């Protein structure tokens, strides 16, 4: 992926130097993704509950558990972080790339919204290491993977997740991993689009009315597959705006990553069996299918997972 000419967004809060937690006495919170502690092995297990990446899992999963008496509603908090925070486009290589990806995502979606007579305000991205305050979505932890917090319109992202995708998920290799990062961020931005369009609130209400956890999970799968499709829409529009930004192997890397974090793949790796009723993000085949649908068609209308047999 060529991104040198991407517009860098300033809607980034860089907490990577915060010390990995809330501060206070002792060493604070530390949840390393590699080595000891919680890593991708934990994510694979948590993936059974939808913790690969997507909407803040405490919102949708918590909602599903409430239906069956298995959990409590998520607690939203005011943001009480400590430690240094930087705002604006980061200058390090990883941070600058993320700022560029967000800038281009915002520009393309702004064009789409304007063409339909609507205004667009982009999401904010919070970069962190290990753990941080997730605002009204509670604690953000590395083991949860990247997620979007609807009430704050914010994407939370520990950039070490991208290394894990390459080294443990084997979702990409070499320069193609840059585009995998773009796919992941575009997926999270897809949830922001759903939020702006009122899809997330409507699905939340439907989940509350669902008669079973399996039914609630099925709704969540449609949300996640639609976000995959919307990420493909962005790639389509970006390619038209900046021909040549994609390089050989980029699309294949995104598809490999989508397959690697499919619910069936994660469940098979974690337990050796697949339970479709417990899916929360969709199968490997579904995730690839809907990303490619968005990429080929380039329209929001093509991403109707709720009526498209997802």
What do the predicted segments below correspond to?
Residues 88-103, 172-184, 214-225, 245-249, ...:
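Soluble non-cytosolic domains of exported or imported proteins
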Residues 48, 109, 157, 183-196, ...:
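Active-site recognition of the HExxH zinc-binding catalytic motif
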Residues 259-310:
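Pan-zinc metallopeptidase signature
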Residues 195-220, 224:
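Post-HEXXH active-site segment of zinc metalloproteases
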Residues 132-138, 192, 260-269:
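Secretory-pathway/luminal and periplasmic proteins that interact with or process carbohydrate-rich
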Residues 96-120, 217-266:
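Short helix/loop segments within enzyme catalytic domains
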Residues 1-86:
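Long amphipathic alpha-helical segments used for membrane anchoring, targeting, substrate engagement
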Residues 74-182, 194-197:
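Peri-catalytic and regulatory segments of divalent metal-dependent proteins
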């Amino acid at each position: 992926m060529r991104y040198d000419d991407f517009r860098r967004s300033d809607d980034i809060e860089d907490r990577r130097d915060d010390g990995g937690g809330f501060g206070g006495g002792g060493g604070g919170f530390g949840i390393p993704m590699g080595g000891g502690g919680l890593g991708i092995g934990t994510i694979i297990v948590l993936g059974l509950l939808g913790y690969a990446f997507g909407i803040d899992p405490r919102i949708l999963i918590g909602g599903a558990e409430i239906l069956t008496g298995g959990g409590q509603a998520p607690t939203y908090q005011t943001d009480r972080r400590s430690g240094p925070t930087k705002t604006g486009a980061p200058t390090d290589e990883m941070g600058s790339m993320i700022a560029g990806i967000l800038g281009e995502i915002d520009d393309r979606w702004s064009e789409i919204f304007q063409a339909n007579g609507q205004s667009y305000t982009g999401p904010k991205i919070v970069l962190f290491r290990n753990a941080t305050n997730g605002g009204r979505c509670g604690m953000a932890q590395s083991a949860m993977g990247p997620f979007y917090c609807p009430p704050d319109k914010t994407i939370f992202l520990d950039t070490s997740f991208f290394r894990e995708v390459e080294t443990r998920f084997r979702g990409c290799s070499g320069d193609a991993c840059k585009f995998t990062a773009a796919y992941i961020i575009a997926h999270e931005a897809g949830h922001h689009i759903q939020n702006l369009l009122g899809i997330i609130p409507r699905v939340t209400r439907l989940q509350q009315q669902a008669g079973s956890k399996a039914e609630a999970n099925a709704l969540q799968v449609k949300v996640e597959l639609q976000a995959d499709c919307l990420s493909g829409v962005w790639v389509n529009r970006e390619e038209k705006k900046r021909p040549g930004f994609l390089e050989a192997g980029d699309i294949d890397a995104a598809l490999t990553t989508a397959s690697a974090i499919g619910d069936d793949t994660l469940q098979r790796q974690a337990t050796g069996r697949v339970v479709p009723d417990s899916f929360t993000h969709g199968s490997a085949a579904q995730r690839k299918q809907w990303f490619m649908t968005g990429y080929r068609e380039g329209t929001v209308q093509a991403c109707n997972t709720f009526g498209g047999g997802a």
